[in-house]
Amino acid sequence: MADTENRILAGKAGIVCCSNGQPPQAEKTLENLREYLSGIGLEPVFTEYIYQKNSVFSGTARQRAESLMSFYRDPEISMIFDISGGDLANEVLPYLDYDVIASSGKEFWGYSDLTTVINAIYARTGKSSVLYQVKNLVSAEGASRQAAFENTLLKSGSDLYDISVRFLQGKQLEGILIGGNIRCLLKLAGTQYWPDMSGKVLLLEALGGDVPKMATYLSQLNQLHVFDQISGVLLGTFTEMEKNGYAPSVEELIKQYVNEKTPVAKTWEIGHGKDAKAVRIGAEIVLDSRQVDKNGKQCG
């Protein structure tokens, strides 16, 4: 929790749910999130489309999109946090007003399935968004990131974005970061929401998925000629793969597709872990071999 003497009033934050609606049992977590954000001087404003009403839907695609746009249009809202995940986020893409988003000074935060919205925003507007799940801040594992979140969001620090990496090949990643969840990113293939890959650093991570699934996702990216266009790859965590020790690993699989001269780095701090940090999609990132590995040891 932020020191009350140093607390900065940050205004209001819109809370949306563009993907699957929240189940009833999430009520306590969301109340804890409300209390936490209020406690650091950030007033949360929840859309009416938060909880599941019809199967996993909190509202229609148009309703969920309009609830997001209402926060972009509201001058009292300074930032927007999406607290959902699952499968439904790409439903809202046709109903978003990208001109309004482009002209706003507000940054969208979300993760997992919100990879679709985040990359669509970049593709259509050139604006960056933050790949991060704010609900993690009130979990037992994620509470350790509260100080970093507060310093980054309220005091213009960078703690939440400072990630450790280990290079698998090459010594530096530099460019505009795109991507996120590998499965969800591929939903955009062939649509107007697919980002330009030229010269970009591609972030890939996943919650579920075994070796065959990772192989087919990477193969699709390869068939889209993504690996011929990008300047480098940043691998986040692949939860199911790493938890079960599946082989070959994603680090091994990726080398079948990328040129040996393409820089590839691994971080344990971006992905679905409750204690994950954040990255800005659509913004410049520079990572080099002087970063530390997961054990805190200097690389390179």
Feature annotation, model-predicted:
Residues T237-G300:
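ATP/nucleoside-binding phosphotransfer catalytic cores, i.e., glycine-rich phosphate-binding loops
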Residues M1-E76:
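ATP/NTP phosphate-donor binding region
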Residues Q146-N222:
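ATP/pyrophosphate-binding catalytic subdomain of soluble kinases
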Residues F46-E48, G110, I230-T237, A265:
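Short internal beta-strands
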